[in-house]
A protein has these predicted regions:
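Short terminal or interdomain "cap/linker" segment that borders an active site or interface and mediates
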Residues: 4-5, 9-12, 17-20, 122-157, ...
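Short, mixed-charge aromatic SLiMs
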Residues: 42-50, 91-92, 182-193
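Residue-level preference for well-ordered alpha-helical positions
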Residues: 37, 167-168
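N-terminal leader/assembly segments
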Residues: 1-78
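Generic serine detector
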Residues: 8, 14-17, 22-23, 42, ...
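Short amphipathic alpha-helical segment that frequently serves as the phosphate-/nucleotide-binding helix
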Residues: 160
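Amphipathic interaction/junction segments at domain boundaries or subunit interfaces
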Residues: 52-157, 180
Length: 194
């Protein structure tokens, strides 16, 4: 194990608005915005648009409404990963920017980020827990707990794209897969890189 779960983590309670804004942007880029907005409803859409104008913490209820509306689109796994890639690219500048710059200049590996994943995760989510288990020098499992967003296929699969893109900042290539969900509020990802 490289990064253990936080002892007795609290349930996820808020999500950084940049995640939702980036996810929404990914849906818009793929031509799904109109259908997404129908699923979301006008009152929630207005709250989300106002909330994502500036970086702030949004309630898990609002985040769940966003991801549930996106989940109802029933996008293919490939499309979900593409949306995750868009989110990752947009977050690179704000959340991972300093690490990305360090990696490009000093030969940092994915373990550099994975060893700090709890801190990086804490910049995106308040509550819940994330842990990293080392399987081999270029192989890990990332486990998410106490996060109700993990119950939504859209969030689980799109996160694969985000993780892959983030890993490829530090490696030539990466592969990320999500295991079938076993318990509510949890997700497990297998990540490998070259």
């Amino acid at each position: 194990m490289r990064v253990p779960h936080v002892p007795s983590p609290k349930q996820l309670r808020s999500v950084r608005s940049t995640l939702l804004a980036s996810s929404r942007h990914g849906l818009e880029e793929r031509g799904h915005l109109a259908t997404y907005l129908q699923r979301l409803g006008s009152a929630r859409d207005e709250r989300l648009r106002e909330a994502t104008m500036v970086t702030q913490w949004l309630s898990v209820d609002l985040a769940t409404a966003h991801y549930a509306a996106a989940d109802a689109l029933e996008l293919s796994e490939a499309e979900l990963r593409e949306v995750g890639n868009v989110v990752g690219a947009r977050l690179e500048g704000s959340l991972l920017g300093s690490l990305a710059r360090l990696a490009r200049t000093s030969g940092v590996t994915p373990w550099t980020v994975l060893q700090r994943l709890e801190r990086v995760w804490g910049r995106m989510y308040q509550g819940g827990s994330v842990a990293v288990f080392e399987l081999a020098p270029k192989d890990a499992v990332i486990e998410v707990r106490r996060n109700p967003l993990a119950d939504l296929r859209y969030w689980r699969v799109a996160l694969c794209g985000l993780m892959r893109g983030s890993t490829e900042i530090f490696a030539r290539s990466a592969h990320v897969s999500v295991e079938p969900q076993k318990l509510p509020g949890t997700a497990r990802y297998h990540i490998s890189w070259a």
